[in-house]
Design a protein with these regions (language model features):
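Long, hydrophobic/aromatic-enriched structural stretches that serve as scaffold segments
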Residues: 166-234
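Short, structured secondary-structure boundary patches
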Residues: 180-183, 239-241, 347
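Internal, hydrophobic cores of structured domains that mediate oligomerization or house catalytic pockets
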Residues: 216-259
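Alpha-helical solenoid scaffolds that mediate protein-protein interactions
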Residues: 198, 205, 224, 231-232, ...
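Secondary-shell segments that build the walls of catalytic and ion/ligand-binding clefts
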Residues: 1-58, 62-65, 69-76, 80-179, ...
Length: 429
């Protein structure tokens, strides 16, 4: 285990307080005032600041209610014997001195910041293997326990994802061989691409689950659900909607270009050339002329088929009867955005525990696991039912059954964890 060192913030805190105390003690402040006053009379007291500070300490230590005080000060080469110097002090003198001290402290603070941050960085990079060894060992032990706990649902999900990927590859090859004769070439092109993306994201969900990141896995399921809903609508509504979806790449590019152009200077990026801007403007005119003004909106590709000039994902979801999953979609959205719900409620925190989750957890994996299996089965079924045959119908039913088994196993393990936690709390009570 790496040797513990004082935290850089603590080092700065102590150094800053020491500097602050030395600069703001009464004798130091008064000595600063005396230095300024002597300078006004042609005497460079800064060369003898320590002597002035001792004189200031004497003045402050001597109890007096008089408006005037005197002290003797020997400054070699500055004051001859017997010379009297009158110094008048008021609030302005103190304010000016305090301003000077404040400036000095700020300057000193920056120096301390620079020095300590450089030292801290050197310490961090000095021996990373020793520093990370303890964390790595803890992480490895956690993942072994996690794998043992969730072994069965993980295995079933692996089988499910592998099967859907295999079906996708076979189906993609078969459908594309038929595409020259098919009227729904665009549908095949879009749905196969959406299916491929969904399988890819399913792999990301698996990786997050196997590392104990329930909330991250849930956020990636949200993407799987969006892909599935989109594929369903396009497959149901046919070639025209598929062609609009493909054409909407242009609308998305126009929107992205306008946003880029707005912030290019701030980000110190090269702005879009006048030639490219003119080309994008012409594309916007062409798309609006061909598909109508609503087409340029978000989800504008679905505006015509939904008879809605400003469709949303929720309206597409409802059109394919998957709005029943909206509560889970909202739950996943909470993990993505910075809202209060997602901050105070985390899937990886069990029950009513009020902890701050800053790493992996062995609980809460069931939601993303079972929903990922469901969405993957749904979109693979969409792919299978384009030009359906006996095999595709059978495999769609197999996927439905396998998805149910995945769900059962994930829920079973989560309930066992919750039951064991209740028993543990009961024993501690």
């Amino acid at each position: 285990m790496p040797t513990k060192r004082p935290h850089a913030a603590a080092e700065f805190h102590h150094a800053f307080l020491a500097a602050l105390r030395s600069q703001t003690e009464p004798a130091h402040v008064l000595a600063g005032v005396l230095t300024n006053k002597l300078r006004q009379q042609g005497i460079d007291g800064s060369k003898h600041f320590d002597a002035l500070k001792r004189a200031a300490e004497q003045l402050l230590a001597a109890p007096s209610t008089a408006e005037q005080s005197s002290f003797e000060l020997a400054l070699d080469g500055e004051i001859t014997s017997g010379r009297n110097v009158n110094i008048h002090l008021d609030g302005t003198d103190l304010e000016q001195t305090v301003e000077g001290i404040t400036s000095a402290i700020e300057t000193a603070s920056q120096g301390i910041f620079d020095s300590l941050s450089a030292t801290a960085l050197q310490n961090v990079l000095k021996d990373p293997a020793a520093r990370l060894l303890h964390l790595t060992n803890e992480r490895d032990a956690f993942m072994r326990r996690l794998e043992l706990t969730w072994a069965e649902p993980f295995k079933l999900l692996d089988i499910h994802v592998a099967l859907c990927q295999e079906i996708g590859e076979v189906r993609n090859d078969w459908l594309r061989r038929q595409r020259r004769r098919a009227k729904d070439i665009a549908v095949v092109d879009v749905v196969t691409r959406l299916h491929g993306r969904t399988v890819l994201v399913a792999g990301e969900v698996q990786a997050l689950l196997r590392n104990g990141f329930a909330d991250g896995a849930m956020s990636r399921w949200r993407t799987m659900h969006e892909l599935t809903v989109t594929a369903m609508l396009i497959a149901e509504r046919g070639p025209d909607v598929a062609e609009r979806y493909i054409a909407h790449v242009g609308a998305d590019s126009i929107k992205a270009a306008r946003q880029y152009q707005r912030f290019a200077a701030v980000l110190q990026h090269r702005p879009i050339s006048a030639r490219d801007q003119k080309r994008l403007d012409a594309l916007a005119v062409d798309l609006e002329r061909k598909y109508g003004k609503p087409f340029l909106n978000d989800y504008g590709w679905a505006a015509d088929t939904l008879r809605n000039p400003n469709p949303t994902f929720a309206s597409i979801e409802a059109a394919v009867d998957l709005d029943r999953l909206r509560p889970y979609f909202k739950l996943a959205s909470n993990t993505v955005h910075a809202g209060a719900k997602g901050t105070f409620f985390r899937l990886g925190v069990l029950g009513d525990q009020d902890g701050i989750l800053a790493g992996a957890s062995n609980v809460g994996l069931q939601e993303a696991g079972r929903l990922a299996a469901l969405s993957l089965a749904q979109i693979t079924t969409v792919l299978l039912l384009i030009h359906p045959n006996t095999d595709s119908i059978i495999w769609s039913r197999v996927l439905g059954g396998l998805s149910s088994k995945v769900e059962q196993q994930f829920v079973k393990v989560q309930r066992r964890i919750e039951r064991e936690e209740r028993q543990l709390r009961k024993g501690e009570a």
